[in-house]
């Protein structure tokens, strides 16, 4: 039996460095790195931030959750 809304939701994480620099404005990076993952809505109600590898920056950067 279902207990209501599912606790797990799919979120998109985007590189904060690529977004801040304006990937297309400065032409430093050819794109914006994005990852798709799931989070538990009950355990982490705030926005998710993880350190992931950005292939455009060629280093580990903070990836923050964005709206769909």
From Swiss-Prot:
Keywords in alphabetical order: Chloroplast, Plastid, Ribonucleoprotein, Ribosomal protein
Gene Ontology process terms (BP): translation
InterPro entries: Ribosomal_bL33, Ribosomal_bL33_CS, Ribosomal_bL33_sf, Ribosomal_zn-bd
Molecular function as annotated in GO: structural constituent of ribosome
A GO CC term attached to the entry: ribosome
Gene3D superfamilies: Ribosomal protein L33
Principal location listed in the UniProt entry: plastid
Domain of life of the organism encoding this protein: Eukaryota
Record-stated family: Belongs to the bacterial ribosomal protein bL33 family.
Descriptive protein name: Large ribosomal subunit protein bL33c
Organism of provenance: Amborella trichopoda
Organism ancestry: Eukaryota, Viridiplantae, Streptophyta, Embryophyta, Tracheophyta
Gene (UniProt): rpl33
